[in-house]
Amino acid sequence: MELYFSWLILALAIFIGTYAFVFGVLRRVNEWYHCGKLGEMKHSLPPGDMGWPLVGNMLSHQKAFKSSEPQSFIYNLFERYGRKGIYRNHIFGSPCVIVVAPEACKQVFLDDENFKMGYPTSTNKLTFRGSFITASKEGQKRIRKLATSPLKGHKAIVVYIDNIEEIVIKSLKGWASLDTPIEFLTEMRKATFKIIANIFLGSSSDSVIGSVEKHYIDYAHGLISPFPINLPGFSFHKAMKARDMLGEILQPVLNERRAMKSDEQKGRKGLIDLLMEVEDENGTKLDDLDIIDMLISFLSAGHESSAHIATWALIHLHKHPQTLRKAKEEQEDIIKKRPSTQKGLTIEEIKQMEYLAKVIAETLRMTNLSPSSFREAEADVNIQGYFIPKGWKVLVYNRGVHYNPENYPDPKQFDPSRWDNHTTRPGSFIPFGGGSRICPGADLAKLEISIFIHYFLLNYKLELQNPECPAEYLPVPRPSDQCLAKVVGFK
């Protein structure tokens, strides 16, 4: 009996000792390492904790995004440290500060002097390979401005309406002709990819577009990989291989466009042609590796946002019949006012889609394709009285901003009417980022979405096969069945 109690006491002592070591010592290693070196300034850091050695809080972050409540990660910070809107943390392999207070978000976005792009290691390794990354800040800014000029503003994007309409009308007609349900999101991605490839590449065969789309899926899964390990079996390794394959596919396209230019062949210019022409402040042009990397990035962002937001908007509309009816009536009114001689949409008509714009804004707020905008402090910075050390990442946490009840009451409810007479506080609506580095394709994406929904509401309905299908949030929010549905035309 005494032996039994001795073993019991020993086991209990080992358990208590292990617990004390794990949570009293091991759990604080990250905190001691990253914050201890700051001396007295560590007391001016935002509230929070640095998680476990090496992995930080990445496991709890991933757990939240694999659940039905991805915003639970930021809600947990609210509960533990109050609604201060700024927290220290350690995710994506780096010490960081998570920002959700609108005023702080605005400061980070507008301060180009103290904050640069600060993508996770996985994104940097997959995205930047050529000389562009070594150019000066002003050189990068100039190249980015020139390269993205065809994508910004109604005057620039109006030239794409006819092309978008053609692909939208043909796609919807084809889907409606099928007797069996389709993975609507998958088909939407194919359609928007055709649109973006046509705009960016000038023109390209279906085989090229299909090959790029095929390898893009593996590439996208590795962009924000929590553990960028380049070994077989890891998503980052598959993404690296996919990136190389994308380069092999796009290089011949680049060579072809260059040959057409040297032979003075006429052809509609795409972004690829513009990227071949731009120069930095020293007159240096982008090398092929830079051009291919930029094309992959633009192709990636350009079709993902349009396809997913249009799909989620239609899902929300079909789950809210009154909202659907109101959105449809607006589109019908636009058609009724149209001259009999006019064929197709005009930019003026798209500007009249005020209610649809609210539907799209609400879908953007709820979906959050990118959970964060990534920056890095280039100097010691003060944000709302808190110290941000040089070299730390700063994550403007979009989902935390958009699901904060202080910014949007009842944030889980789809409610386009919340945008009626709504004055958006700077930094409180940031689906495309903000500041000088705001997503250059935002206007083009909203144009695509508007045209898709316009033609869909007028001519089709969506019969969801699994109306209560749960959502998945990695790598981006989507229905787990890819929105399995029938597209039914009105007779």
From Swiss-Prot:
Localization terms from the record: Membrane
CC annotations in GO: endoplasmic reticulum; membrane
Keyword check for Iron: yes
Location, primary (coarse class): membrane
Biological processes per GO annotation: pollen tube development
Molecular function in Gene Ontology: ent-kaurenoic acid monooxygenase activity; heme binding; iron ion binding
Membrane-topology descriptor: Single-pass membrane protein
Keywords carried by this UniProt record: Heme, Iron, Membrane, Metal-binding, Monooxygenase, Oxidoreductase, Transmembrane, Transmembrane helix
InterPro entries with a match to the protein in the record: Cyt_P450, Cyt_P450_CS, Cyt_P450_E_grp-I, Cyt_P450_sf
Catalytic activity reported: luvungin A + reduced [NADPH--hemoprotein reductase] + O2 = (1S)-1-hydroxy-luvungin A + oxidized [NADPH--hemoprotein reductase] + H2O + H(+)
Pfam families: p450
The protein's role, per its UniProt record: Monooxygenase involved in the biosynthesis of limonoids triterpene natural products such as limonin, a compound with insecticidal activity responsible for the bitter taste in citrus. Catalyzes the conversion of luvungin A to (1S)-1-hydroxy-luvungin A.
Name the UniProt record assigns to this protein: (1S)-1-hydroxy-luvungin A synthase CYP88A37
Biological source species: Citrus sinensis
Gene that encodes it: CYP88A37
